[in-house]
């Protein structure tokens, strides 16, 4: 299998499926649904083959494929995976299949176009995670906006147009900044003695850029990624998009699309701009903490189930960002695992809320109560996912959050303490929500006639719940997958720190000699002086 272009097969198989769907008569809705699910299921199985042939001890890119694309520009079709991107590829293929299966009963209009959009979206998301050329990455990054735009704008709720335009404008604004950064990086790579104009990520990672360039480029990329995460204060598009999106759109949005932002920091910000990363670490960490606490507090007062889950994502992804910028092995590995955990837990929450909405056509918490007596299987599934979301030991949420807190505690006790408060608040708003929906008297007569989960709905939820329990009990295979890649990533950042420290020592000795009159004054030290600013404010 390693001789096959397996990464390309996984990436473009959904695109082929979308093309096949276009050939099917729109009146054959059952055939369209089965074909879409079949393509997504096969894509997931092929991605499992990718995992089965992955060498865990190899830190670099594997299954790399390279071909000339835009020769005169230096852009290539270059794809591959490492331990970080592999897990996200698996998450994408898994959740897309789940989302399509969950849409069988929920979508009744323009079914053909809906399934085409989901498959096109899958190819766009997979392309983001496997692209190793910046132009190719940007094409996938912006390309996935189009199907998501239509998913929310056509099949969304009453305020779908407002939510769609807001989502599109926010993401496009960040994309423009990133495009400027990509172009600047391209000219910096070739505009130096012996340089080569390139968009290749691996070649660009080897550049030794001055701190000023790193700082500006980091900001250009970071804003684009922070909008996608979304980090506070770039989060305002998310609740509207979630509330108006169809169930499958919310599952994909929360489960995968938001991870594109955190993945961007790991894949681009840290290796390309290590000095700027260290310098901006305190700022990003504080924004992450504000997001953790703000998201939790706002979730507590939400009357809408979907909006509550949406704001909880702001809080959970604040933990991911805090772990990444702890720049420790535990922090980064915990952040990657928590990306997977959040995709499963929050995706499952949106599935359950969607199933409830299909029965009652309302998401208001006040419209429920006492459901545990009426739909016990649904209640049990909801309980497992709720406990997972608050990080109960034995379920997946605990492992990631624990590693993030350990990694953060090693570098800043205050950060870890404030983040811990976010976990307590998460337990408050999630358990309070569960209590109001599932317990107490049945106050609405419409709730008495609710039916429990169907066989199809149980088939949708069962694999997600199984993974939630599996990761909580035995997370080692997932951590082992990312171990070598995380070590290589942090070694790059640490190497740059040591080089800067050595450079400062040499300059200090040189200045001392000049003061003592033993060495002539150098012509210009402006660049080196600015370099010293690259060290983080907290000394990391």
Residue ranges with predicted function:
Residues 232, 346-349, 417-449:
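Predominantly late transmembrane helices and immediately cytosolic-facing juxtamembrane segments
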Residues 1-6, 20-116, 192-208:
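Transmembrane helix-loop-helix hairpins at membrane boundaries of multipass inner-membrane proteins
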Residues 8-23, 37-52, 89-103, 121-123, ...:
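Central hydrophobic cores of alpha-helical transmembrane segments in multi-pass inner-membrane proteins
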Residues 54-76, 176-235, 240, 265-283, ...:
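Juxtamembrane/interfacial segments at transmembrane-helix boundaries in multi-pass membrane proteins
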Residues 2-13, 81-92, 134-147, 214-225, ...:
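Structural signature of hydrophobic alpha-helical transmembrane segments
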Residues 18-29, 96-108, 150-159, 229-243, ...:
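C-terminal ends of transmembrane helices
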Residues 27-30, 113-120, 124-213, 298-311, ...:
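Alpha-helical multi-pass transmembrane bundles of energy-transducing inner-membrane proteins
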Residues 477-540:
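Low-complexity, proline/glycine-enriched hydrophobic segments characteristic of transmembrane helices
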């Amino acid at each position: 299998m390693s001789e096959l272009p397996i990464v390309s097969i996984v990436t473009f198989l959904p695109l082929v499926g979308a093309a096949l769907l276009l050939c099917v008569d729109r009146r054959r809705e059952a055939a369209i649904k089965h074909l879409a699910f079949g393509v997504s299921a096969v894509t997931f199985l092929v991605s499992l083959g990718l995992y089965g042939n992955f060498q865990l001890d190899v830190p670099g890119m594997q299954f790399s494929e390279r071909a000339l694309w835009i020769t005169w520009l230096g852009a290539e079709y270059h794809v591959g995976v490492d331990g970080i991107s592999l897990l996200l590829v698996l998450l994408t293929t898994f959740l897309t299949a789940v989302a399509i299966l969950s849409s069988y009963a929920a979508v009744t209009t323009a079914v053909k176009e809906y399934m085409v959009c989901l498959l096109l979206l899958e190819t766009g998301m997979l392309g983001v995670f496997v692209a190793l050329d910046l132009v190719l990455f940007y094409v996938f990054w912006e390309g996935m906006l189009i199907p998501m735009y239509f998913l929310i704008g056509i099949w969304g709720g009453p305020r779908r147009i407002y939510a769609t335009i807001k989502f599109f404008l926010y993401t496009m604004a960040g994309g423009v900044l990133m495009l400027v950064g990509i172009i600047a990086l391209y000219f910096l790579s070739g505009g130096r003695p012996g340089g080569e104009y390139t968009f290749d990520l691996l070649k660009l990672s080897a550049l030794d850029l001055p701190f000023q360039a790193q700082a500006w480029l980091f900001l250009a990329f970071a804003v684009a990624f922070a909008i996608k995460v979304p980090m506070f204060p770039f989060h305002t598009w998310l609740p509207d998009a979630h509330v108006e999106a169809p169930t499958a759109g919310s599952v994909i949005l929360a489960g995968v699309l938001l991870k594109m932002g955190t993945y961007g920091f790991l894949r681009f910000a840290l290796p390309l701009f290590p000095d700027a990363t260290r310098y901006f670490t305190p700022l990003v960490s504080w924004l992450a903490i504000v997001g953790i606490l703000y998201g939790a507090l706002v979730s507590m007062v939400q009357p809408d189930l979907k909006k509550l889950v949406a704001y909880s994502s702001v809080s959970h992804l604040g933990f991911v960002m805090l772990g990444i910028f702890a720049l420790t092995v535990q922090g980064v590995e915990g952040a990657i695992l928590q990306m997977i955990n959040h995709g499963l837990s929050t995706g499952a929450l949106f599935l359950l809320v969607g199933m409830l909405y299909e029965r009652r056509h309302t998401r208001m918490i006040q419209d429920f109560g006492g459901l545990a007596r009426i739909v016990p299987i649904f209640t049990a599934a909801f309980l497992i996912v709720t406990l997972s979301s608050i990080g109960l030991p034995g379920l997946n949420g605990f492992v990631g959050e624990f590693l993030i807190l350990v990694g953060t505690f090693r570098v800043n006790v205050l950060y870890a303490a404030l983040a811990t408060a976010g976990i307590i608040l998460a337990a408050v708003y999630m358990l309070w929500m569960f209590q109001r929906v599932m317990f107490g008297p049945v106050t609405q007569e419409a709730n008495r006639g609710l039916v429990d989960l169907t066989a199809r709905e149980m088939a949708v939820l069962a694999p997600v719940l199984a993974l939630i329990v599996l990761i909580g009990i035995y997370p080692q295979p997932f951590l082992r997958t990312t171990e070598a890649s995380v070590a290589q990533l942090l070694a790059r950042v640490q190497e740059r720190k040591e080089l800067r420290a050595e450079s400062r020592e040499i300059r200090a000795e040189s200045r001392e000699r000049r003061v003592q009159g033993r060495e002539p004054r150098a012509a210009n030290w402006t660049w080196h002086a600015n370099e010293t600013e690259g060290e983080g404010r907290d000394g990391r």
